[in-house]
Amino acid sequence: MLDDSLLEDFIHSFFGYGSDSADLWFIGMEEGGGTTEDEIARRLSFWQSRGQNELEDVCDYHEALGMGDFFREPVKLQRTWAQLCRIALSAQGEPDDLAAVKAFQRDRLGRWNSSNCLMELLPLASPGTGHWLYPNWSKLRFLSSREGYKDRVLPMRIRSLKQRIEERQPFCVVFYGSVYRDHWESIAGSAFTRIDPDGFGWVKKNGTNFLITQHPAAKGITNQYFQSVGKFIRSLRRL
């Protein structure tokens, strides 16, 4: 079984990868993975060994999990990260071809010294919304079901992310996964009043631009879609 005390600390304190002083934040619903108890135990152990940071370095963290192929040659693209890289590159007016995306994932995505960060609304890695394995690994009562977990964790995580954004005031926060729009609007503190013709929402609140996009793993989504998101962010810098 997992160390439930450490697991609960992780649920309250871990938010993702990169630096929250970055001007571009990506926030998703939850991280993929979490297919075995051993993987989760390694996630917790490495997090504890590094001082239980709220934000980790994505490369160091995944190297410790045995997933270093995402950060060394030949770079293995991670499907979600690849499109977030494409957004970031396009937002800076840089090429977003395959080689550029691989280089960005390898060197510039979610690092402690990077200009972006990757956060998750829900802290526990899971292979999908239809899978919930934690009752097999933990005695925490609220983890006995996914619904119980969400009921317990979502309100506090929404509050924490909202407060962090208000304190740090990043230039742009990109929420990906439009089916979670209600949660994203709760964090932004505003409805997404404009829907861009390219299919994403935008609103500006207290100096921060908030975008809501399709999930990179959504069926039928194209590279051009995420390129257009990045170009839109770039256009906001000129306003």
PLM regions with names:
Residues 1-168, 216-219:
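A polyanion-binding, active-site-adjacent surface
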Residues 13-16, 60, 175, 199-201, ...:
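Intrinsically disordered, low-complexity N-terminal regions enriched in serine/proline/glycine
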Residues 22, 169-171, 204-209:
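A short helix->loop->beta-strand "cap" motif at the edges of active sites that frequently abuts
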Residues 27-28, 165, 169-184:
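Glycine-rich anion-binding loop/nest that anchors nucleotide
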